[in-house]
Amino acid sequence: MAGEADGRFKGLLVPILLPEKCYDQLFVQWDLLHVPCLKILLSKGLGLGIVAGSLLVKLPQVFKLLGAKSAEGLSLQSVMLELVALTGTVVYSITNNFPFSSWGEALFLTLQTVAICFLVMHYRGETVKGVAFLACYAMVLLALLSPLTPLAVVTLLQASNVPAVVVGKLLQAATNYRNGHTGQLSAITVFMLFGGSLARIFTSVQETGDPLMAGVFVVSSLCNGLIAAQVLFYWNAKAPHKQKKEQ
């Protein structure tokens, strides 16, 4: 029975969270302070946690838009630039065969960001434009994932993530500052993005060793931190028309 239980436990960890040599090091030899293997376990665990959490990260934002039937306070340009950055990460990671645990959340965030882009257009009375956007985006994504796309183009797209993230977040920050409130921006989504990007700095260094990936997450953390700070600063601020209704 003990052997069966050990086998099941090993099956849960190897190779999802640990390579076999690290499993032996930690759970057979009981060398629980083996730093390299502990780093792998922490990185894989964090990575899979981030991927699982990403399924829900932007849903509060989607539901807030649907509930309010308004995209007030959201910068479409900012959301679009975030989509460019996420798409670059997905394509670059697939092309380089990085472990799914090191980038999987980008795929789920991409799908949710596409939905937000469409909803922003829809609630601005541009539904046809939104449908056209969905079709165009699907074609561009298929083209980028095609073997015909040169690696240099994919690398350039990933390198463009840094300016895309910076400009996109600054546009949203400027919109918040100009409005004096954060409108329909979801605080839950903002804080989850901030926490996820911080954790990704460690996991990207540990799992991919790619300085470009790590650099993108460092910049993303700084920019997400700025938006999170604005959410806290404008926590009790409301749009002028809402203030009038309350009066």
Swiss-Prot record:
The keyword Calcium does not apply. The modification N-acetylalanine is found at A2. Residues 39-105, 159-216 form the PQ-loop domain. InterPro entries: MannP-dilichol_defect-1, PQ-loop_rpt. The chain crosses the membrane at residues 37-57, 74-94, 100-120, 128-145, 151-171, 185-205, 213-233. It comes from the Eukaryota. Coiled coil: none annotated. It is found in: Membrane. The keyword NADP does not apply. Keywords: Acetylation, Membrane, Repeat, Transmembrane, Transmembrane helix, Transport. It is a multi-pass membrane protein. One of its GO terms (cellular component) is membrane. Gene3D superfamilies: 1.20.1280.290. Pfam families: PQ-loop. Belongs to the MPDU1 (TC 2.A.43.3) family. Required for normal utilization of mannose-dolichol phosphate (Dol-P-Man) in the synthesis of N-linked and O-linked oligosaccharides and GPI anchors. This is Mannose-P-dolichol utilization defect 1 protein. The lineage of its organism: Eukaryota, Metazoa, Chordata, Craniata, Vertebrata.
